[in-house]
Amino acid sequence: MPRGEREQLIVEAAIAEFSRATYAGASLAAIAAQADVSKTLIISYFGSKEAVYAACVTKIGTQIEQAVADALNSPHHLAGAGAAGERVLAAIFTTFEGHPGDWHVLFDRSVPHGPARDAAREQRTILRQQAFAGVSRSLGSVGLTDPVDLVAATGVWEHMVSALMLFWRNHPEESAAAMVARAHRVLAAMAGHTLDRVRG
């Protein structure tokens, strides 16, 4: 197997292990077992657990960034703030279908200060900037243009997405389509629409 492919297999195994055990609880030995390789091979490829984690969060962050960018650049994004938000959520849910716990690897609070935490922070910063741009465009279309309001709205959006992903992690039997529908109902109800109207 080419080295590049084997590295990707190791990263995928590491994401699963970090999702299951957190950074603090994960070990290179456990990752090696999941990837069906030796711990020595992982060290020769990556050098350290921190470097493995950095590769993981880079992959996760890139996946989210691309999915959200595609949703934001879609013509359907112009259909209104609510529809745009649901489209972004649908893109995120589709990306993580079958492995919703991957999202939380990027937000793992057990990661110590150092290169690993810096790598995760870098990815979160990119996603926060992307979220701010999307929120500003969507909510600007309905009149919310105050810069501080938009910063607050971006924080609300980020925490809402994380809450939905935590729910999904705790209910992994839910499909991406089911999560899209659930988010639609919740957001519509919070906006004051009746469920009969939403279902209709």
Where are these regions (language model features)?
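Helix-turn-helix
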Residues: 9, 13, 17-51, 55
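Pre-recognition alpha-helix immediately N-terminal to the DNA-recognition helix
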Residues: 9-17, 63, 87, 91
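Regular secondary-structure segments
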Residues: 15, 19, 65, 69-72, ...
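Short helix-capping/turn signature of helix-turn-helix
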Residues: 46, 108-113
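Alpha-helical DNA-contacting segments of helix-turn-helix folds
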Residues: 54-60, 67, 123, 127
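Hydrophobic alpha-helical connector segments
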Residues: 55, 69-101, 141, 145-147, ...
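Amphipathic alpha-helical packing segments from all-alpha helical-bundle domains
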Residues: 65, 94, 115-141, 151-155, ...
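Hydrophobic/aromatic-rich alpha-helical bundle segments in the mid-to-C-terminal region
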Residues: 103-104, 108, 117, 139-187, ...
